[in-house]
From Swiss-Prot:
PANTHER family per the UniProt record, alphabetical: MITOCHONDRIAL DNA REPAIR PROTEIN RECA HOMOLOG-RELATED (PTHR45900:SF1), RECA (PTHR45900)
SMART domains reported in the protein's UniProt record: AAA (SM00382)
Family: Belongs to the RecA family.
Organism, scientific name: Gloeothece citriformis (strain PCC 7424) (Cyanothece sp. (strain PCC 7424))
Gene name tied to this protein: recA
Residues the record lists as binding ATP: 69-76
Keywords: ATP-binding, Cytoplasm, DNA damage, DNA recombination, DNA repair, DNA-binding, Nucleotide-binding, SOS response
Main location: cytoplasm
Entry-linked InterPro entries: AAA+_ATPase (IPR003593), DNA_recomb/repair_RecA (IPR013765), DNA_recomb/repair_RecA_CS (IPR020584), P-loop_NTPase (IPR027417), RecA-like_C (IPR049261), RecA-like_N (IPR049428), RecA_ATP-bd (IPR020588), RecA_C_sf (IPR023400)
PROSITE patterns: RECA_1, RECA_2, RECA_3
GO CC annotations, alphabetized: cytosol
Protein name: Protein RecA
Localization, UniProt: Cytoplasm
GO function terms (MF aspect): ATP binding; ATP hydrolysis activity; ATP-dependent DNA damage sensor activity; damaged DNA binding; single-stranded DNA binding
Amino acid sequence: MATITNNPDKEKALNLVLNQIERSFGKGSIMRLGDAARMRVETIPSGALTLDLALGGGLPKGRVIEIYGPESSGKTTLALHAIAEVQKAGGVAAFVDAEHALDPTYSEVLGVDIHNLLVAQPDTGESALEIVDQLVRSAAVDIVVVDSVAALVPRAEIEGEMGDNQVGLQARLMSKALRKIAGNIGKSGCVVIFLNQLRQKIGVTYGSPEVTTGGTALKFYASVRLDIRRIQTLKKGSEGEYGIRAKVKVAKNKVAPPFRIAEFDIIFGKGISQMGCMIDMAEHTDVITRKGAWYSYNGENIAQGRDNAVKYLEENLDVAAIIEKQVREKLDIASLSFAGSGNDDEEEFEAVEAEE
């Protein structure tokens, strides 16, 4: 064990108190950071390669994550893709459906193993957060998604009258619950994702009027906060709308540089376009080149137009695997367990506050 001080008496006293703390509170309760076997934060894939790179490798394990944005922006879709990725790796996933709006058919299309997905539909916010805490403490679950914070209604509000003015109940509930969850989540390595909605503050002249629900506790306890927005509706000739283009701003990141931007397509009925992410990053790293509407790989034209390029990769998975490997090497992310790719666009979103 490395020494902290050159004074032998101090070192002896320090080792004595460290041993005493470990006897009282358990092995690993205190340690020199340099002695830790694994200091790098492990990650799980988000389901979008562009977002994985923006996050520094993926969603960090043992952390609280908040995904917020307007309605129909892709929050639940992104969370379900993360669940699918965990299940593909042999992990256990849980979905706390406070909104009572989970669609099993759509979840299955995204790759979620609905037969082994743990689902809870609690009636009160207290019940939902207690379920989350127990799942985290079990250390048997790899990811828990709460949909959503706005639907975590305190018991006192449910049992009260519609006209009762109960200020700050949900904020106090979230603050108390997160204090408990945060203490256990690091030990279990579980990823806890809270989906959150946006509200508008009245009378705001300067700055963004948007606020997230549930008070400010989640803002502080979350290691990663993702602001997801719909920026474009995808249309194809006479077929009409077939998807959306989503942009995610990493508004907060304690484990990698924040404020990065990622974009990806969400296809209606299919979810996030993995090959679309691949095309974007391959073009960004010059693995695939584009001249006009033509995309070429290794000097040969492979498709005309982005949609056809995506279709080409979907039909030639062996080529897609080679391109993915080359993209990872170009971005120097080959060593990451769940490597992804992203967009370093520095466009700023306005800061979103939290509603009390």
